[in-house]
Amino acid sequence: MASKEMFEDTVEERVINEEYKIWKKNTPFLYDLVMTHALQWPSLTVQWLPEVTKPEGKDYALHWLVLGTHTSDEQNHLVVARVHIPNDDAQFDASHCDSDKGEFGGFGSVTGKIECEIKINHEGEVNRARYMPQNPHIIATKTPSSDVLVFDYTKHPAKPDPSGECNPDLRLRGHQKEGYGLSWNSNLSGHLLSASDDHTVCLWDINAGPKEGKIVDAKAIFTGHSAVVEDVAWHLLHESLFGSVADDQKLMIWDTRSNTTSKPSHLVDAHTAEVNCLSFNPYSEFILATGSADKTVALWDLRNLKLKLHTFESHKDEIFQVHWSPHNETILASSGTDRRLNVWDLSKIGEEQSAEDAEDGPPELLFIHGGHTAKISDFSWNPNEPWVICSVSEDNIMQIWQMAENIYNDEESDVTTSELEGQGS
């Protein structure tokens, strides 16, 4: 039996490598930017910070990322990294690529540098890290324990204490187990939600300050789910509304003004398998999306949750991340176990397709990023550079990329499919 499994693994590995080679050959046609960077350890989390600096007379801008580590029994860190992203006028040429390193060059002086700027000791791997919108120096993290940690990275040395001691500014208590979901309220400073394997969602107000030492107890614990709560998200326009999704296949909408924490305002059987993630649309107060182990992304309208608006189908395995674009109301991306990051355009739902196009996926599937050869752990849309995404996968690879403008601008591409498929063969 073992040999059969080994054989299947080898075949899969071969297929993955083959697909990667084809992807790499086609990058000049498909992307305006691709930067591939091997991290020292895999990161389970990634988020762009909102800050951007444009150095005088340089052909790049500086951006920052929040990352974490997932080591093999070595010291873990919360990481802030600095990234050089070439300006539009710095000619990026994806065809200049060093095939051994998987590095893409061709920016003139910029080689798409990525440097670790701050490393802070962390207790165990960083399951997820998210900055507080009202003060991006403040970062909350999910740990392998039940504690949620809060760090103000300006109060920590750039190089971690060699003792390995983890010294968070606050320690948030209320969960019994670890988890992944984490969401800061963009309308109420300091209000943080966390989802856990203990079937609950905790809410803290970090402004309340610690009761003793650095410990802050949960302000409320929401107990509606009957299984692991995978993700939680505040509504972006209503300060008291949030959503949670869980392995009980349900999406729940909660209102913190309600006098009960055991029953949500709305409950919907969202998928036919575990629901792993959700995201509220930043432009439309009624629209949200959920992603599931049933390999689909579902679109919902808060005014009528009984009816699923749309199902996005193309992923071949579980979906773990879904995020709306910060710049375009109709653009959404999803990723997960199938090593693909799909970008969807709601405005194309129902468009007519040729039989040939239909084979590639539904009309609303705008783009498939195929650069990862392992499961994608997380991704983040750059808030300052439209269409730039950073994605991280389980094999230590981080990619910063932007699809070619002709793909999202609806202009007829001058690249024929035969050129793409047959290139170099």
Curated annotation (Swiss-Prot):
Keywords: Acetylation, Chaperone, Chromatin regulator, DNA replication, Isopeptide bond, Nucleus, Phosphoprotein, Repeat, Repressor, Transcription, Transcription regulation, Ubl conjugation, WD repeat. InterPro entries: G-protein_beta_WD-40_rep, Histone-bd_RBBP4-like_N, WD40/YVTN_repeat-like_dom_sf, WD40_repeat_CS, WD40_repeat_dom_sf, WD40_rpt, WD_repeat_RBAP46/RBAP48/MSI1. Gene3D superfamilies: YVTN repeat-like/Quinoprotein amine dehydrogenase. SMART domains: WD40 (SM00320). There is a cross-link at residues 4, 101, 155, 159 (Glycyl lysine isopeptide (Lys-Gly) (interchain with G-Cter in SUMO2)). Changing residue 285 to K: In SPGFX9; uncertain significance. Disulfide bonds: none annotated. GO terms for cellular component: ATPase complex; chromosome, telomeric region; cytosol; ESC/E(Z) complex; histone deacetylase complex; nucleoplasm; nucleus; NuRD complex. The modification N-acetylalanine is found at residue 2. Pfam families: CAF1C_H4-bd, WD40. The keyword Coiled coil does not apply. The keyword Methyltransferase does not apply. One of its GO terms (biological process) is DNA replication. WD repeats lie at residues 47-122, 128-173, 181-217, 228-269, 275-312, 318-369, 376-403. The modification Phosphothreonine is found at residue 10. It is found in: Nucleus. Its main location: nucleus. GO terms for molecular function: histone binding; RNA binding. Belongs to the WD repeat RBAP46/RBAP48/MSI1 family. It is linked to Spermatogenic failure, X-linked, 9: A male infertility disorder characterized by spermatogenesis maturation arrest and non-obstructive azoospermia. Core histone-binding subunit that may target chromatin remodeling factors, histone acetyltransferases and histone deacetylases to their histone substrates in a manner that is regulated by nucleosomal DNA. Component of several complexes which regulate chromatin metabolism. Binds directly to helix 1 of the histone fold of histone H4, a region that is not accessible when H4 is in chromatin. Subunit of the type B histone acetyltransferase (HAT) complex, composed of RBBP7 and HAT1. Subunit of the core histone deacetylase (HDAC) complex, which is composed of HDAC1, HDAC2, RBBP4 and RBBP7. The core HDAC complex associates with SIN3A, ARID4B/SAP180, SAP18, SAP30, SAP130, SUDS3/SAP45 and possibly ARID4A/RBP1 and ING1 to form the SIN3 HDAC complex. This is Histone-binding protein RBBP7.
